[in-house]
């Protein structure tokens, strides 16, 4: 009988230990499952909180880069049109006689702007072949369209070293206060630019040129 009671007591103790062990396993399993379930929730919330912030930063950076690119492009276009584009010249001022085809007729003068680059002597020969001469500036009033010219062009003005004067192809002397002569290079020929300015240039330097033909 004592042996039986001892066996029962040991069995009860083993069952109690087994029950406690199961409880510990269940608690441990529940804790593990709870942590596994909680972690994705926490991570998901972190991602939900972080994603809008990084998305907003990305959009802001992209818009900033686009703005810089657009400003650069428009600045380049503006500067190019400012320095290189010729202003449209009015063609309806006063009576004008017949001019060669495609020439500009303005206040009894015919003008042609040639975009090909030649030295001064070649430009002079080109104008003479068309029964014209290089540009001669003789009146700010009658030639006010020349204020609109933007780039540099050969005109028929040359420097005479013997007396230091400037004269036109026809031998007439440059009238005082008609042109402002600016020394850009060492030379004996002159380029016309905007606002009745003449720029000294070496005669052998290639430049565009203006031919002129009087109609009266």
Swiss-Prot record:
Residues glycosylated per entry: 115, 131, 163, 202
Record has Transmembrane as a keyword: yes
Membrane disposition: Single-pass type II membrane protein
PROSITE patterns reported in the protein's UniProt record: C_TYPE_LECTIN_2
Annotated tissue distribution: Natural killer cells.
Gene Ontology CC terms: cell surface; external side of plasma membrane
Keyword match Transmembrane helix: yes
Transmembrane segments: 52-72
Molecular function in Gene Ontology: carbohydrate binding; identical protein binding; MHC class I protein binding; MHC class Ib receptor activity; signaling receptor activity
Pfam family, one: Lectin_C
Disulfide cysteine pairs (residue numbers): 96-105, 99-110, 127-211, 189-203
PANTHER family hit by this protein: NKG2-D TYPE II INTEGRAL MEMBRANE PROTEIN
Note in the entry: Is not capable of signal transduction by itself, but operates through the adapter protein HCST.
Subunit structure as annotated in this protein's UniProt entry: Homodimer; disulfide-linked. Heterohexamer composed of two subunits of KLRK1 and four subunits of HCST/DAP10. Interacts (via transmembrane domain) with HCST/DAP10 (via transmembrane domain); the interaction is required for KLRK1 NK cell surface and induces NK cell-mediated cytotoxicity. Can form disulfide-bonded heterodimer with CD94. Interacts with CEACAM1; recruits PTPN6 that dephosphorylates VAV1.
Record-given protein name: NKG2-D type II integral membrane protein
The organism of origin for this protein: Pan troglodytes
């Amino acid at each position: 009988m004592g042996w039986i009671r001892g066996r029962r007591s040991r069995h009860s103790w083993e069952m109690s230990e087994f029950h406690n062990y199961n409880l510990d396993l269940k608690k441990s399993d529940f804790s593990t499952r709870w942590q596994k379930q909680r972690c994705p929730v926490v991570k998901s919330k972190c991602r939900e909180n972080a994603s809008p912030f990084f998305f907003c930063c990305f959009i802001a950076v992209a818009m900033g880069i686009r703005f810089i690119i657009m400003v650069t492009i428009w600045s380049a276009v503006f500067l190019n049109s400012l320095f290189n584009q010729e202003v449209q010249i009015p063609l309806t001022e006063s009576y004008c006689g017949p001019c060669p085809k495609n020439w500009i007729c303005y206040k009894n003068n015919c003008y042609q702007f040639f975009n090909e680059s030649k030295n001064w002597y070649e430009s002079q020969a080109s104008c003479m072949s068309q029964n014209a001469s290089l540009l001669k500036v003789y009146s700010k009033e009658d030639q006010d369209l020349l204020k609109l010219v933007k780039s540099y062009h050969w005109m028929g003005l040359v420097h005479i070293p013997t007396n230091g004067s400037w004269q036109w192809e026809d031998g007439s002397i440059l009238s005082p206060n008609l042109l402002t002569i600016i020394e850009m290079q060492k030379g004996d020929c002159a380029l016309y630019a905007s606002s009745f300015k003449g720029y000294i240039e070496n005669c052998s330097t290639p430049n565009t040129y203006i031919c002129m033909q009087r109609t009266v």
